[in-house]
């Protein structure tokens, strides 16, 4: 299947527009699964039927995380506004959840990283319920059952592409609500364990 079929599914609006859409789902208790599309997951879709189905599913919200995705859409004359990075989206969603006193589950990264992020969130938003588990468990599906039991409002999974997306997809039917997003290495940045590149380099992917 041509890459352009996946690109047609990508959200065309601004980062702010998408944050409003995701924030509405968070506030109203809707279910929203977000996939941050970069060249890696688009290429993997060519050889993986599960990823292909996920990207083409009308229920999946796909955003352009990667300047090359934005440029490819422009070359194909597909509507697109700007790059929407996973780390920016994760930060906005966490802030929205904190302000609304929603519950959050963080899965992935090293213990010291994910625990530092959880502590940081609790300090900033004392009324937000934060649960977490590192990404080194041998049975990720068993780990995810803990999330199913908790039924949180926001779930961030940092296990890398495409493992994080496929894991969420396998269990999504067990949730009545929640915003779900795979965030790759974002916990390192969000926790303060790793500095992020200046905004100019993020926007231009240089």
Predicted regions: what is each one?
Residues 38-41, 159-164, 186:
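Short glycine-rich anion-binding loops that position phosphate/pyrophosphate groups of nucleotides
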Residues 31, 102, 175-178:
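A short helix->loop->beta-strand "cap" motif at the edges of active sites that frequently abuts
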Residues 151-156, 161, 177:
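Proline-aspartate-enriched helix->loop->beta-strand connector
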Residues 1-82:
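N-terminal nucleotide/polyanion-binding subdomain common to many enzyme families
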Residues 135-139, 176-206:
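Short, flexible loop segments at boundaries between secondary-structure elements
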Residues 61, 103, 153-154, 179:
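Structural motif
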Residues 49-58, 165-185:
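A short, gly/pro- and small-residue-rich
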Residues 70-151:
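Conserved beta-alpha
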């Amino acid at each position: 299947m041509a890459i352009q079929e996946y690109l047609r599914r990508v959200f065309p609006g601004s980062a702010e527009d998408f944050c409003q859409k995701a924030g509405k789902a968070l506030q109203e208790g809707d279910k929203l699964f977000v996939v941050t599309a970069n060249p890696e997951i688009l290429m993997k879709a060519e050889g993986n039927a599960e990823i292909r189905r996920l990207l083409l599913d009308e229920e999946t919200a796909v955003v352009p995380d990667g300047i090359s995705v934005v440029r490819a859409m422009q070359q194909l004359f597909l509507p697109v506004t700007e790059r929407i990075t996973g780390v920016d989206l994760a930060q906005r969603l966490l802030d929205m959840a904190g302000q609304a006193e929603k519950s959050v589950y963080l899965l992935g990264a090293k213990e010291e990283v994910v625990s530092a992020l959880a502590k940081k969130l609790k300090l900033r938003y004392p009324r937000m319920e934060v649960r977490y588990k590192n990404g080194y468990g041998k049975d990720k599906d068993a780990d995810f059952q803990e999330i199913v039991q908790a039924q949180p409002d926001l779930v961030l999974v940092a296990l890398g592409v495409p493992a994080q997306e496929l894991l969420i997809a396998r269990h999504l039917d067990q949730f009545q609500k929640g915003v779900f997003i795979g965030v790759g290495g974002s916990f390192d940045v969000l926790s303060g364990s790793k500095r992020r590149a200046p905004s100019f380099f993020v926007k231009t992917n240089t």
